[in-house]
Amino acid sequence: MNKICSLLILILLNSQLLNAQIINGKITDLNTKESLIGVNIISEEGSGTASDIDGEYQLKLTEGNQKITFKYIGYEEITKTFNIAKNEILNLNIALSSTSEELNTIVVSAGRFEQKIEEITVSMEVIKPSLIENKNTTDIQTVMDQIPGVNITDGQANIRGGSGWSFGAGTRVLVLVDDMPLISGDAGQVQWKLIATENINQVEVIKGASSALYGSSALNGVINIRTAFPSQNDIDKNKFPGYTKINTHFGLIDKPKREELNWNGDKRRAFKGIEFLHAMKISSLDLSLGGNIFLDDGFRQGEVTDRKRFNINSTYKSKKINGLSYGLNANFLFQTTGSAIIWDSYDRAYIPLNNEITTTAGDTYNIDPFIIYMSGNNRHSLRTRYLKVINDNSTKGRDNEQDNKSEIYYTDYQWQKNIEKYNIRITSGTTNEIVYAKANLFNGKNTRTNNSIYTQIDKKIGKFNLSFGARYEQFTIKSDKKYVINGDSINKFSAGKPVFRTGVNYQAAEATFVRSSWGQGFRFPSMAELFISANQGGLEIYPNPDLKPEKGWSAELGIKQGIKYGKWVGFIDIAGFLMQYDDMMEFTFNQWGDPSTAPLLGLGFKAVNSGNTQINGLEISINGQGKINKNLSLNILAGYTYMDHFSLDPDKIYAYAGDNQGVSYTNSSSDPTVLKYRYKHIAKFDTEITYKKLSFAASYRYNDFMSNIDYIFTTPLVNEGIPGIFEGIPGINESRENAKDGDYVIDTRLGWQMNDAFRFGFVVNNILNREYMTRPATMMSPRTFAVQCNIKI
């Protein structure tokens, strides 16, 4: 019976095809010959489809004269006119040429589909892989800190002043790799070291609340690292299967300017590393294998790093089912690192407080199976992730009972529908995340679940691009331990909230685009912020199970102006922005413990809801690349950000410390007129000039004085201590006095492209050997020198 039914269905389908006119073919890049996925094929009569994962398409038509248009972002549009007879099957292969004299920056993060950057409704910066390679990047955070409006402090990203110092727990900026979150399940820490710097296509940074499309941690923005597919153009250049990249480097850390800071004598600390990538296509399989080995003696005493990382990216395109592809991506990290939080003193700034270094032997890995199916104008994707983080912590060679382990099971199903006739694209999906965590410092075993549904609609009307999105999220954390809150003994914490966003982009002139957007954000506290009880680097960290979720919104009005000089193209972007947060969560330094019994007189950190806040400001940036003339090319990324940030209720008591003393923003701040651990002015630029085979580049980063920190850091209790009881943390006030005019750092680099296979570089970071800090009581690296050799065969 089943065979008969199958035969009848087959006959019915064939009869429909026999009584229809069909055009089919394959669409490729004119220069690289690579298949183009998602090209829109639209007939004049209104029907349409899109090319599949192999670049192939098929479209039913009525008989007679037809006019078909092939449209793809970043490529010249092609229109074909022809006559198709009754029941004819016409094969038409198309080769599209790129619009080479446009900036041609295509992004996916703003709406989870490909768009030109000038047409999106939010502010976004894009980093290309050349900057990552040429800066001798051993950790992607280095490049993130070069982006206008972005700062990285202790591994936490801060966009336009949206975050202060979060002590490495929780994040308001969601970091993704190929649309998948890369944040630990317990502490909410970004797993920067797991990111394969050797296989990056581009980095996209959304500035502003993006929770509607990406979820809780996107309250302040999104950083999406997009990995590269094997390039057919590069493969065709080689006699061997695929192509291989090998980058090696060796560097030295210079002595600090002040002799008091030189804890290592005349011996120079060194760092060295190698990273490699092999990419190939085997029939219908795209495969990339990569890895990195990095050894760093460290510029601080005891902060030694031994890191090994390996990765695989694979995609198989089904030969049996058109439009079906599936694969597996994975990263494996094995490392031993030392970390310190606070210096011993201003004159011993590269020595940790009380010589206490936390050494972490950690294994981190993610395994990501996925499946994608494209049919006509529909796209279905199912992405899954297993992320495991294991940290074995010790202090001075002894187990400190602060080990932690977490596992994440993550699933995201997404459906996209492109209705070409009405210029509408619908993106909808559901996300599920389960976290299992075990750690003494988080009071045993904890479980977290996060379920959400989301949708976004994008519509093009003439020169307008409109966008609307919504999401609902529900969080639950369950702990083995019960906590007494408002007289109730509980071990379950839950919260849920809908969030919305909307935006519009208008093309006012040929190269002028005006945009406006508004979006809500929501963030549930991490397990670390709720439950942590630990001593790290000599400082106590206290739990706060009474912590509430934070929420907020952001809005902006911006204009993007295209500029062109010969074959050099770029954009100037100006944006005004406004953000408000309710119940903002911040780690705050105060006397949270009992002064008579707790270590360090009860001094330490705790996450608290510090009230309602506002941040508004202005940002100007420029991003461009291309040739000035036949032999000279110029790449530039630059920007200035002004931020005015303050508490909306500075006198409100939001916590109690010490002997039950009320804590408000006013009495806990060194400057209560602004928010803590933030700047008001940030300026950055990176410029690279290439003449024939030689290149020279300079990077500059400036921030003004961080006027507001936790007030207790500035008191005699902390700076001078109490003789015989507490030695204090000397030099915080002195260092701040010396930084009153702000800090700036200049990096330089030279490059020589010997031939297509070999490139050599010389990189000097902090060339002026300046003393600078990103927060109180932590001195950043003195000058470093590095030589690099990049091979591509």
What are these regions (language model features)?
Residues 92, 194-245:
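A beta-strand signature from Gram-negative outer-membrane beta-barrel systems
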Residues 28-32, 39-44, 71-75, 85, ...:
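Short, acidic, small-residue-rich periplasmic hinge/interaction motif at the N-terminus
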Residues 384-385, 389-393, 515, 548-604, ...:
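Membrane-embedded beta-barrel scaffold of Gram-negative outer-membrane proteins
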Residues 247, 577-580, 603-712:
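Gram-negative outer-membrane beta-barrel transporters
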Residues 57-60, 180-209:
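Short acidic/polar hinge/loop motifs at secondary-structure boundaries
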Residues 124, 141-180, 184:
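Extracytoplasmic beta-strand/coil segments of soluble accessory domains associated
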Residues 296-311, 315-373, 378-380, 386-410, ...:
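Flexible loop and strand-edge segments within Gram-negative outer membrane beta-barrel domains
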Residues 371, 420-431, 435, 439-579, ...:
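Structural signature of Gram-negative outer-membrane beta-barrels, strongest in the C-terminal barrel
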